[in-house]
Amino acid sequence: MNEKVRQLVEELFTDPRYLLRGEADRFGDKRLAFSEVCPLLSATGEPIGQLLLSREYRRRGRPDGERPHGQESLLDFYHDQLFQGRLPALAREDAAALREESWLYYIRRNFFFQLGEYDNARQDAEHNLGLLDLLQGYAADEADKWSMARWWPWIERDRAIAAALAALEQEDLLTTASELYRAEKSIREFGEQHAEDYAREDAEKLVTTMVSHVARVAELLREEENLPEAPEERLERAVDAVDAEEIERLRREMERELSGEG
């Protein structure tokens, strides 16, 4: 992959609070070794230094290695409860536990981005989207629903960029273009739908920042990797122009491209 693309990924997916050191091998169990940066404060609350805590995350399953209720993750546990028809409304402590799990997967997916393991990063982003959906459907408190939903633009940015870069590695430029175009559009629409919620928190910048990040990746890939225009974008432009002949031509072209035909 182009070095400029790697540099942008490093910029977007490095959290200075969690510094990846490399891999550790524990009797054949490879883990991600990192340092957590913890600020040291004086009695008056002034920063006086930093403490580096050595941590390790498992590469598979829940990053901290815990198995809540004997399942691979809380998401797996609640999905099992749903399957059995036994999931009650999620109390505030349940929602807090789900948010804590989402934080573990957020940290690890950043590491996967830094390592160039884009499909693993995508899977961890999808895990957190699953947690978000769970809270949206079953949290008893509306505040708990929004506490995760507000981060949807961030998680979708990560999922889409990871999926796009994984497709790029397979030289599937159309999928790369489609992932980025759809994400940029859907994040912008989400921000419009929830404009009042973000305004109450003075957090409108979250949405615009995530949109700009996806756009930056797409622009760089167009410059460095000859990324084509997304089929959906071409079709929407034809629809806006009310050009029936062009719409039909593009529809047939999209079908050929997405089916892999010449």
Residue ranges and their predicted role:
Residues 81, 85-102, 144-156, 216-228:
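TPR-adjacent "capping" and linker segments in tetratricopeptide-repeat scaffold/adaptor proteins
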Residues 121, 128, 173-179, 229-231, ...:
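Solenoid-repeat scaffolds in large eukaryotic assemblies
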Residues 97-114, 126-129, 133, 150-169, ...:
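Amphipathic alpha-helical repeat scaffolds of TPR domains
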Residues 1-136, 171-190:
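N-terminal alpha-helical interaction modules that lie
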Residues 181, 206-230, 236, 240-243:
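N-terminal cationic and glycine-rich segments that engage phosphates or anionic surfaces
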Residues 112, 166-167, 234, 238-241:
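Hydrophobic side-chain positions on well-ordered alpha-helices
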